[in-house]
Amino acid sequence: MIARNEYKKLFVEVSPAFYKNMLFNAINKKEKIMVAYQEDPSRPFRDSDFLKGEKEFEYINMTGSPWKMCRELAALVKNTHYGELIVGGYDRIYSWVAVMLSPKKKNAVIIESTLRETQKKGWRVLLKKIFFRRVNKAYVCGKSHEDLVRFFGFKGKVVDILSVGFIRRVPQPVYEERDKVTNFVYVGRLIPVKNLEWLIERFVSHPELKLTIIGTGELEEKLKAMAPENVHFTGAIPNTALPQYYQKADVFVLPSYSESYGLVVEEALNNGTPVLLSHMIGCQDNLVVNNDVGLVFKLNDVADFERQMSRICNANFYNHLRKNVSKMDFEKFEENIVRAFIG
């Protein structure tokens, strides 16, 4: 019998996000957990986007100055009985405070970054190696994430948790053959790291194809000014309406310079849509390549993009991908994520 202040797992996380909260709800149904959130100024607790969704687990919201939150976290770690301490990442001071105060044998870290996007030289590398000496277990989201912890000399246990959280899952669409591939869709923020200027330039050369861009951001007006007639902007779309856009599209495209995971790729696949991704997307290996549900092109390589675009626009090959997507079981996928955590 677990006492009120005893938990199987104590999670240390940044401001709550819906996809993490849904995962924590599922884990808490199997074993008692506590989540300590530290407020991120860029994602304050009052931001409704990150507060949506009920929390069915015990949690604490830490606010104020970083020093105040560090002191509060230190007291929590010291006075709470837990079987495992799991910190979300290694680049925040709160993760360091937690793993330094907790016994190494209880310490674990969730890795959402990949080796591709990580600095490999300099004093920060030494700091990260010190951090990983205080950790006994690393939860990763695929091979590219495991490569990162091994690069920093981690010798402990590695557990593949498959994903960073739970998407707003819908029933997987049944397979329906399509006779042509012309409609592409992008969903996300309109910011430099998403590489949308480069993507729009590609569609200038393909007036026979259509690209729908869903989202808002600092580059919105600039992108609209450079976009040809076959590129359409919708602005912000409610989450409840996104499935119809995914399912109407033939291909979801994500050309980002960097995506530590890419949860939006899961959303597209859950809506039956094959994907076309740059090689900098973290989920490409486990989720896309291994399941044969999309194609990957080398970042900013126009020739390679054109090759992969030509392949995915071939109706026979496209329908092969689409049939594979229809076989994906995201309910089972979520069960496996939870199972990875509870071991």
Residue positions per predicted region:
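Nucleotide-activated donor-binding/catalytic signature segment of Leloir-type glycosyltransferases, i.e.
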Residues: 221-237
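A short, histidine- and acid-enriched strand-loop-helix "catalytic/donor-clamping" loop
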Residues: 107-123, 134-137
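Conserved donor-binding/catalytic core segment of Leloir-type glycosyltransferases
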Residues: 176-194, 200-206, 211
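Donor nucleotide-sugar binding/catalytic pocket of nucleotide-sugar-dependent glycosyltransferases
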Residues: 133-173, 178-179, 234
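Short alpha-helical donor nucleotide-sugar binding micro-motif in glycosyltransferases
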Residues: 236-237, 244-249
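Short hydrophobic beta-strand element within catalytic cores of glycosyltransferases
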Residues: 274-278
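A charged, aromatic-enriched C-terminal amphipathic alpha-helix characteristic of glycosyltransferases
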Residues: 316-343
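Aromatic "clamp/platform" in nucleotide-sugar-dependent glycosyltransferases that forms part
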Residues: 257
